[in-house]
């Protein structure tokens, strides 16, 4: 839930974020389906570009300093375009995939320009990226689970589709996974 972390007077962040929650239930799937690779990373040198100010501070009782998200949009954008693509490529290599194998890109819903840059890098039309940013804004850690749930409920995924999930976040951190969709019994 981002509304409590965003300073509503900060035009650099207030208009970008939405509230959301999501989860993914992981269970046994037939051989050849499910997650095929994971990539996770972090680089604390980028921490000053995206962080929750005051989140880890113990303040005296009565002190009014709510934790607020602080970001350097230009630096976060450059980081996101680079690491989203790099980590997604690494996840594909680990899974033995190429960009031609991708049926759907399911990216973190931070900024449509970042998603467009990822599609361009992988030679995918934007229609092959699951997006809901225009409806909900950046829902932070909920964005990929929400995108998965929405696409599945719309019947967009077919049994055996190759999904490439990729995201990034505060700190600065990143992750990607390749998965083969199982439509279930």
PLM region spans:
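Short, catalytically relevant binding-site loops at active-site mouths
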Residues: 2, 42-43, 112-113
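Short, surface-exposed connector motifs at secondary-structure boundaries
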Residues: 96-101
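Catalytic metal-binding/acid-base residues of hydrolase active sites
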Residues: 1-2, 30
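Condensing-enzyme catalytic core mediating Claisen C-C bond formation in acyl metabolism
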Residues: 8-82, 86, 168, 180-185
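Claisen-condensing/thiolase-fold acyl-transfer catalytic domains that form or cleave C-C bonds
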Residues: 81, 85, 103-185
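Glycine/threonine-rich beta-strand-loop-alpha-helix active-site module
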Residues: 2-8
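Stable alpha-helical structural segments in soluble proteins, enriched in small hydrophobic residues
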Residues: 87-95, 147
